[in-house]
Amino acid sequence: CAWPPGSAAPPPAAAETGVQVIAKDCFVTEDSIAIADEVPVVLTNPQLYEAPELLVEWYRERKRDLPWRHHVNAYRVWVSEIMLQQTRVEAVKPFFERFMTELPTVKDLAEAPEDKLLKLWEGLGYYNRVRNMQKAAQKIEEEYAGKFPENYEEIKALPGIGNYTAGAISSFAYGIPKPAVDGNVLRVVSRLLASDEDIMKASVRTKIENAIEPVIPEDAASD
């Protein structure tokens, strides 16, 4: 919404000092603000601006050697993130390596016979995950000429991909600073914000995503 002439505009350094206000669908006059829709307000703890540098340093010194962190591309990140849903890292490793050997590209996944696909997934469970992956791969082949999209919204529009996976692909594969918010991130950030809101609510997740996206270092988004 626009601030009328002569009225006090919000200070440009507000976000840096710990306040980020996000409003939508509102009308501002000299004497009042009329709100026509829900207004999410995020009070950003200054610690959120200090944490990324420390976390990046810690990660670079202690990161685990995982197969999907080698030869990084959007396809490999995507496959690993879908496999890691509801499944332990150690359990995923052999499945990931076998899957990459048998279906190394989006095209291979799009064209794989269903029996082969399900056999490769056998032991991971939740078979709809891999069925959605094939639908997404087919969409990439048809609409993007086989090239994995780089735009966050286009990635999120693929079957079986939500905010977290789209954020992970954007960050890890393309270096685009987008949040990948899972349960661990929700718990840590809610404590930094001194929030007692229910982190299981979609509105709270959105609030936390809005809070951390501006503080993701552009030069370390893939970390």
Where are these regions (language model features)?
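Catalytic cores of DNA base-excision repair glycosylases
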Residues: 35-49, 53-223
